[in-house]
Amino acid sequence: MRKIFCILLVLSLMLPALPASAAGTGPTVAAKSALLMDAATGTVLLEQNAHEKLPPASVTKVMTMLLIMEAIDSGKIGWNDTVTASETAAAKGGSQIYLKVGETMTVTDMLKSVAVSSANDCACALAEHIAGSEDAFVQLMNQRASELGMNDTHFVNCTGLDDDEAAKAHLTSAYDIALMSRELMVNHPDIKKFTTIWMDTVRDGTFGLANTNKLVRFYKGTTGLKTGYTTKAGFCLSATARRDGMELIAVVLGSETSQDRFQSCKQMLDYGFANYALVHPAPEGSHTVPVTLGKQQTVSAVPAEDTAFLIDKAQLSQVKIQVAMDDSVAAPVSKGQRLGTMTISAGGQVLRQIPMVATEAVQKKGFWDVFVSILRKICMAREP
């Protein structure tokens, strides 16, 4: 027999989970392509032509910033490293901070300029600093896109500028933008200290930066992320916001006006926050399993992975959690060894099954340990 522990979660947890794609009926979006995704689980809540390949303009820089943050977090480059502007970087058009050839600036200030003001010259300078050239950096961008499953994407440059013939092949989709936005915001949260800035300066306060993402100032909970515009791409935006422990990613490509992109993302975010919630159900109490011939008598078990799932606020079905643990386990026990299963279900339907695993290793008793244990039991049995 297996020990069964049941928990009924009331009201706030009385809601069935959503599948990885649960796109529903939401607001009308004024864009060629759009998508709303939950950052924690990757669940798609809304989509409109989400896999159509379109030019993303400066939303491209989400991938540029991702690779920069990965280089920083891995120790390849440092926040205070000095970056020197090349002739190529200084010649970039579009949004910029007007770097001069040979001008130096820290990684921090250049990344801030990219995140806040969409500076193409700084994006190129950082790309060259990391990979040696923009072309080499673009290879890294496409490699990372492939690793993330961005199957609709091909990058040609690190900026999103599309004013030359080669840039006709620079395409991605709303879905792919959500994927890279999720990777950046979830795994490299330090980027938010830049993407939430409304106004700031660089060059010792002599050059002002104003965020191109107006939601930073006007939408509660905004955490980022990146705007984009060219004549070919139209107005684009990857917008992220967090409320009540849930972070959402809203993407639009090809809006006709700047107001359309902000309003469309705002409406999608409003829809998501109004209709869904992220919950983290956990088994009640502690769960242990007796260890046969172990140097300790029991071993504790916990869920092997995050139990978070998205729930629809409109539904009120009970969620049941069952934890079934093995009656015993023979030593040696490895840390992370499966000792049972946590099952989350609703309305008789299994939503998730998560392994319960050992929190620590337990060594097997040696001959002398067994001998002493037997001797102790004999002595205790003879006591009056």
Predicted segments with their positions:
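Positively charged n-region of N-terminal signal peptides that target proteins for export
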Residues: 1-9
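Structural motif marking the loop-to-transmembrane transition
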Residues: 1-2, 56, 107, 367, ...
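Hydrophobic core
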Residues: 9-17
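Intrinsically disordered, low-complexity repeat and linker tracts
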Residues: 14, 21-22, 287, 384
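Residues in and immediately flanking transmembrane alpha helices
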Residues: 15-16, 74, 280-283
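Active-site-adjacent loops and short helices of periplasmic peptidoglycan-processing enzymes
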Residues: 20-181, 185-188
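Domain-terminus/edge residues, biased toward the C-terminal soluble/receptor-binding domains
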Residues: 150-151, 168-384
